[in-house]
Each structure stands twice: as structure tokens, then as C-alpha cells.
Amino acid sequence: MYFTLILENESGEQVNLSTTANQYMTSKIEGLNSPAGTVSTSSYAGMNGSYLNNAFIEKRNVVISFAMRGIGIEKRRHQLYQVVKPSRYIKIWYKTANIDVYAEGYVETCEVSNFEQQISGQISILCPDIYWYSRDIFYAYYSGVTGAFHFPFPESDAPFPLGVYATNDTFSIVNDGDETGFTLRIEALPSDIPQEVVAVTPTIYNENGEYLQIKGDILTGDVITVTTKTGSKTVTLTRNGVDSNILNRLVSGSTWLTLKEGTNIFRVEAVRGVKKLRVTLMHRNSYLGV
């Protein structure tokens, strides 16, 4: 199977480990499949069977085995060391004919045999975030007003629309990967009145009735960014170019919504001014195994 494998450090420097006749011959990549789960159970007293305490996946371990070919091996070995440094951040880009993904982790070891006739090596990378993520970002939009202005510009005196109010306060997005969090961007539509309160307490509902609600006023020019991804859940308000943490405005009972596999439908509501909001949902497909 043909594949592309590139390692990139936090400075953006890359080393291409894709199989070539005179560079690297990657013989094995471990850690592409789903990581092993940890399952904890306890026995019933005097009864058959047991009950589940918890089950989770701790981390992903990607191990790359390779050989070095051609001339200039020592130079390429030092180039490898420059990019792949133990304990440092690394991004793994992996691409086949059907998938283009990346994972992020930290280098555990980078070992190369220096004194053998056939130069070989192995790189071990630990990924606290267990998922592979698609290179592409996918978007879904909701807007209370949809632009209707177009060219050529009408020349008659008859009225023509500049915008159309939405009659449906829902939007949908397809998730082709595993269940994952997402980033939600809530913006107030432009207004001629500076610092006008355009909306109050927006709420996002999923199909199951679970919701994420942020109390308070949204002023002209405000942008609220919500991230529901495990390990980086945040609620941030950008006002007049200044970011501030507004996690305390998340209403009790709210759920950190996620994208289930397949089609997801969301509904936008607000105490006031829902038609003056623009909502953008962004996510990358995530995969336990590729």
C-alpha cells in the first residue's frame, strides 16, 4: 500500500519518512489502529459475573520502524535528529489513497543504529490525544438573515431584497468520523448602533434535547467561541479585540455538546434577538483507527 508519512516539529520543520529507494524504507508503523482500552471491573459478592467500574483509553503509541538507504546517510540522520527530539512535540502526517490525517504527540525515543551494515532505526511517539484528525476542516452555518444582494444590480425602481430572514432556526452537519467535540462561533450581525444589545442568552440544542446555553447580552461586534473537545473545553468572549474567559456564563444544566457519527441537527434559540445571530460550527473528522 502506498502511503505518505511526514513528521513535523513545533517549529514547522519536517522530515519525510515515506518509502523511497534512496532515502527511507519504512518497514512498519504501529499505532495506526485503535489503541487498547483499559477496563476495570469488580466481582459481585457470592454471585457470577462482575460490574464495570470504568473503561477508558489512556494514550496512543505510534512506533515507526525504518531503514536508511542511499548516500549521505549521516547527513540525513542528523536532519532526523534535528526534527525528532525526545520529549518534544511532534505532528504525524499520514496519507493514503482514501484518508489524509494527522496525530499529535511527544517523542519518546528516536534510535538509529550507527555501526551496522544496514542502517535502521525506530521512533516511538506517545500521543495523549488518542485520535487521528482529518486535514480538512468541515463547516456548518446558521444565520438569521441570508444575503440576497446580487449582480447584475437591478436597474428598475421596483423593490428588491438585500437579505432574507431565515424561517428555520436549525442547521445540520455530517460527521464521517468517530464522535468528537467541535468549535462553535457565535457572532452578532452588524448594526449601525455601536455597543447595541443585539441578542440575549443564546442556546444551542441537539436532537436529543441537550443544550448549551450562555447567559447574558451579546453586543454589536461580539464573538463568542465555544470549544467542546475533550481536554480543551473553553468559552471565550472577544469584545473590542480583547479575549476573556466567560466559562462562568455557561448556564447550569448545559451539556458540552458533541458530534455523533452521521448527520447531526442543531437548533439555535435565544431569549431575544436570535435572528441577529450568525453561528458557525467547525470540526475535523476524528478517527480511533486509520
Region roles according to the model:
Residues M1-T41:
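Polar/acidic, low-complexity leader/linker segments enriched in S/T/G and N/D
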Residues M47-I71, Q117-I130, N264:
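Oligomerization/assembly interface segments of phage tail-like spikes and tubes
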Residues Y133-Y141:
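Short, charged, solvent-exposed linker or helix-capping segments at domain edges/interfaces
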